Amino acid sequence: MSQSTSVLRRNGFTFKQFFVAHDRCAMKVGTDGILLGAWAPVAGVKRCLDIGAGSGLLALMLAQRTSDSVIIDAVELESEAAAQAQENINQSPWAERINVHTADIQQWLTQQTVRFDLIISNPPYYQQGVECATPQREQARYTTTLDHPSLLTCAAECITEEGFFCVVLPEQVGNGFTELALSMGWHLRLRTDVAENEARLPHRVLLAFSPQAGECFSDRLVIRGPDQNYSEAYTALTQAFYLFM
């Protein structure tokens, strides 16, 4: 689906090469997921895992960015979201490369022997607090179903020695997540702090961890320039996806 032939549709988000319906998912397509899907390092990967796939956004973005030989497994606990992810993937150019699994990631991994070069997750980060409108949204927002230590343990169980585990989190939560990951034997290899504009402090952080030690590359990404248009850096990162960029 090219930019010129794409048609804007309701109840979802239209990208240059695919459409993501999200009306049956607790968490909608947003900047966090788009950032993560565009940013995660994909060079040389052969097998990818999306933990908490939701609408299938990250799996679809990885499919667009990788070669036809790369297989992507997308695991989602909530049945309605998993069904919608499957529908989105079936309508995409990469249906044969993405496998959707309706499952608890911890239970699913006990049945797997394959290891992944890239693991990606846009995880819950709220502690239990204000009640959500639906159980599905609570599951997507809060760490009660899969807390951060469990998420890091799951990733460690199935990642290759040189693989990357990538997440996007609020800045302060990301700092705590990093401390936890380091204490569990992970090594931080990539970090991008994301700010809305030059005048704002970073509000999100993109993190890539690996079992293998090495230099950590850190940078800063500003989403909008002084004119409130998308910055050159944000445009370069995401223009393969946004319809009118």
Swiss-Prot record:
Location in the cell: Cytoplasm
Main location group: cytoplasm
Enzyme class: transferase
EC number: 2.1.1.223
Molecular function as annotated in GO: nucleic acid binding; tRNA (adenine-N6)-methyltransferase activity
CDD domains: AdoMet_MTases
Keyword terms of this UniProt record: Cytoplasm, Methyltransferase, S-adenosyl-L-methionine, Transferase, tRNA processing
Protein name: tRNA1(Val) (adenine(37)-N6)-methyltransferase
Organism: Shigella sonnei (strain Ss046)
Taxonomic lineage: Bacteria, Pseudomonadati, Pseudomonadota, Gammaproteobacteria, Enterobacterales
